[in-house]
A protein has these predicted regions:
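Bacterial N-terminal signal peptides that target proteins for export
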Residues: 1-7
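Hydrophobic helical h-region of N-terminal Sec-dependent signal peptides
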Residues: 8-14
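Sec/Tat signal peptide C-region and signal peptidase I cleavage site
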Residues: 16-20
Length: 137
């Protein structure tokens, strides 16, 4: 009787592990990233955190983003089901509401910046973020 349930659980765990393996891996380098998210796996479909919590994206809403008043190539994704997941050390991704958008851009020197946003409208600039994390590509 438990065999089908065990098989289903195993399939779900294998699928989430395979997803993380197919996405690009980013190593946490900023103090904030190391203490909140740990390493992350990111692609056009979602973001998985070191503790295996994840955010799924519904669509790409912008391919450029204002950072320090400069337009940079980057990606702004809408989160399919906004959430503020509990990550490492009991910390939350944003801490001030559900994350509805995630943006990432090249921060130079082999680094990637990932910012998270609350709100109903897509963010226009980094000034609107609730948290910023930096990773090594």
């Amino acid at each position: 009787m438990l065999r089908p349930q065990v098989a289903l659980i195993a399939a779900i765990l294998t699928t989430s592990s395979l997803y993380a393996q197919s996405a690009d891996h980013y190593t946490a380098v900023s103090n904030t990233a190391m203490s909140v998210t740990g390493d992350v796996w990111l692609d056009d479909f979602g973001m998985t955190f070191e503790n295996e919590e994840a955010l799924e994206f519904s669509d790409l809403v912008a391919d450029h983003f204002l950072v320090d008043n400069r337009s940079l190539p980057g990606s702004v994704y809408r989160v399919k089901v906004p959430a503020d997941p509990e990550l490492q050390n009991g910390n939350q991704l944003c801490g001030s509401g559900d994350v509805a958008y995630v943006a990432n851009w090249d921060a130079g020197n082999g680094l990637t910046a990932i910012a998270v946003f609350t709100g109903k409208r897509p963010p226009k600039s980094s000034d609107e973020m609730c948290a910023l994390y930096t990773y090594q590509e």
